[in-house]
Amino acid sequence: MAFKLPNLPYAYDALEPYIDQRTMEFHHDKHHNTYVTKLNATVEGTELEHQSLADMIANLDKVPEAMRMSVRNNGGGHFNHSLFWEILSPNSEEKGGVIDDIKAQWGTLDEFKNEFANKATTLFGSGWTWLVVNDGKLEIVTTPNQDNPLTEGKTPILLFDVWEHAYYLKYQNKRPDYMTAFWNIVNWKKVDELYQAAK
């Protein structure tokens, strides 16, 4: 069964002015689609073709060595972007159990955002910043390239794309501005669903 590029759950221009239509078109239709195409080419005709992407990434050490790097990069790229589209929304409301637990752990939502932003804006090169559930607790982590916290047994519930292709058309080298804009379009309802399922 071939992996498929998911449809966006909103229009390309729905996240404006925070993420522009042109960026969304390139990011989804070109970058994400390339990961899917390369992943399918890697796993075609193997047992991995019938495995879930989450299982494949969580058990990367069991992927045959000849395919491991491609699955790590392209499978990771497909998984990460698929989740990223889901946790974005033009209708962002800061509520839910995850918000309460963030406040309980960090003191305030702003303190959490500050720590998350600091990790995102100081990450060298390309990668992702994540809010994960690790042994029932919330934790902010970063990964390089298309790596994923699933490989370390952590469950991702929120993620921020730090690759330049995610923001350069609009923000150029101003990664902190892109980070600030991100909070206006977080789908906290989806984040909370993922959190409740992971606890």
Swiss-Prot record:
Cofactors named for this entry: Mn(2+); Fe(3+)
Cofactor note (record): Binds 1 Mn(2+) or Fe(3+) ion per subunit.
Catalytic activity, EC: 1.15.1.1
SUPFAM superfamilies found in the cross-reference section: Fe,Mn superoxide dismutase (SOD), C-terminal domain (SSF54719), Fe,Mn superoxide dismutase (SOD), N-terminal domain (SSF46609)
Binding residues for Fe(3+): 27, 81, 161, 165
Catalytic reactions on record: 2 superoxide + 2 H(+) = H2O2 + O2
PROSITE patterns on file: SOD_MN
Induction: Transcriptionally induced by externally generated superoxide stress in a manganese-dependent way. The presence of manganese increases SodA homodimer activity and simultaneously decreases SodM homodimer activity. This occurs primarily due to post-transcriptional effects, since the expression of the gene is independent of manganese availability in the absence of superoxide generating compounds.
Broad class of enzyme this protein falls into: oxidoreductase
Residues that coordinate or bind Mn(2+): 27, 81, 161, 165
Recorded GO MF terms: metal ion binding; superoxide dismutase activity
GO cellular component term of the entry, any: cytoplasm
One annotated GO biological process: removal of superoxide radicals
Keywords: Iron, Manganese, Metal-binding, Oxidoreductase, Stress response
Assembly with partners or alone: Homodimer. Can also form a heterodimer with SodA.
Note: According to PubMed:11344148 the levels of SodM activity and sodM expression are growth-phase dependent, occurring most during the late-exponential and stationary phases. This response is also dependent on the level of aeration with highest activity occurring under high aeration. SodM expression under low-aeration growth conditions is most abundant during the late-exponential phase while under high-aeration growth conditions is highest during the stationary phase.
Similarity annotation: Belongs to the iron/manganese superoxide dismutase family.
PANTHER family: 37S RIBOSOMAL PROTEIN S26, MITOCHONDRIAL (PTHR43595), SMALL RIBOSOMAL SUBUNIT PROTEIN MS42 (PTHR43595:SF2)
Functional summary from the UniProt entry: Destroys superoxide anion radicals which are normally produced within the cells and which are toxic to biological systems. Catalyzes the dismutation of superoxide anion radicals into O2 and H2O2 by successive reduction and oxidation of the transition metal ion at the active site. May play a role in maintaining cell viability during the late-exponential and stationary phases of growth since it becomes a major source of activity under oxidative stress. Has a role in resisting external superoxide stress. Involved in acid tolerance and the acid-adaptive response.
Name of this protein: Superoxide dismutase [Mn/Fe] 2
Lineage: Bacteria, Bacillati, Bacillota, Bacilli, Bacillales
